[in-house]
UniProtKB/Swiss-Prot annotation:
One of its GO terms (cellular component) is cytoplasm. This is Adenosine 5'-monophosphoramidase HINT1. Belongs to the HINT family. It is found in: Cytoplasm; Nucleus.
């Protein structure tokens, strides 16, 4: 976890990201779901027995810069996350998280929804 915090503290918005490369299929990912608006794939550094990301294909660097016309797309990410969680057997519950900015732990500046499950989640989370 400390490694992710360190990455978040030095990450900055702008430019291409690893998620752009995954969307363009330039680098591999364990894809769970894909449609014309988003992509869901397993996290390469899972923080729970099941941990996947749902990302929009349209680049939006942060929730804080999302526009009103992104509302449907951002809602779609949550619906896809719910469906993928069900497909992966997370029937006892799961957590959805969006990290915003360096203090929020955002290490990749392309909006992404974390879905974590397969164990009891604790509160507070961080």
């Amino acid at each position: 976890m400390a490694d992710e915090i360190a990455k978040a503290q030095v990450a900055r918005p702008g430019g291409d990201t690893i998620f752009g490369k995954i969307i363009r299929k330039e680098i591999p990912a364990k894809i769970i779901f894909e449609d014309d608006r988003c992509l869901a794939f397993h996290d390469i550094s899972p923080q729970a027995p099941t941990h996947f990301l749902v990302i929009p294909k349209k680049h939006i660097s942060q929730i804080s810069v999302a526009e009103d016309d992104n509302e449907s797309l951002l809602g779609h990410l949550m619906i896809v996350g719910k469906k993928c969680a069900a497909d992966l057997g997370l029937n006892k519950g799961y957590r959805m998280v969006v990290n915003e900015g360096s203090d929020g732990g955002q290490s990749v500046y392309h909006v992404h929804l974390h879905v974590l499950g397969g164990r009891q989640m604790h509160w507070p989370p961080g």
